Amino acid sequence: MTMTDPIADMLTRVRNANMVRHEKLELPASNIKKQIAEILKSEGFIKNVEYVEDDKQGVIRLFLKYGQNNERVITGLKRISKPGLRVYAKANEVPKVLNGLGIALVSTSEGVITDKEARKRNVGGEIIAYVW
């Protein structure tokens, strides 16, 4: 069976693993998922990312991050642009998430970047998701 929305599947897997405090999770690899995983790592939402090559499409292994008292670092994930309703923003309309406490993932012609980076580079694009 083909997957309609692989990005929503990735976000749901991260959300579910985070809720039950799993240390790591695996998901099928794709270029956009790799870019999203790298952003989550650089923004401090996850500990580490590994790419495992197999004979098929490969696997991304995410290592989730928790605070000192085992509190969650990722408190929320929300898919914004969906296959049935795409959401785009111009460079000057890229939204802030929780007044800058969270990030918006923006798919641009320069790849997937955060909302802060999109404002800095003055580029717009498709608003993939919010993470806070």
UniProtKB/Swiss-Prot annotation:
GO MF term set: rRNA binding; structural constituent of ribosome
Pfam families: Ribosomal_S8
Keywords for the protein's UniProt record, in alphabetical order: Ribonucleoprotein, Ribosomal protein, RNA-binding, rRNA-binding
Record GO biological process: translation
Family matches, as InterPro entries: Ribosomal_uS8, Ribosomal_uS8_CS, Ribosomal_uS8_sf
Top-level lineage group: Bacteria
One Gene Ontology cellular component: ribonucleoprotein complex
Keyword Ribosomal protein attached: yes
Similarity annotation: Belongs to the universal ribosomal protein uS8 family.
Function statement: One of the primary rRNA binding proteins, it binds directly to 16S rRNA central domain where it helps coordinate assembly of the platform of the 30S subunit.
NCBIfam families: PRK00136.1 (NF001109)
Quaternary state and interactors: Part of the 30S ribosomal subunit. Contacts proteins S5 and S12.
Protein name: Small ribosomal subunit protein uS8
Gene for this chain: rpsH
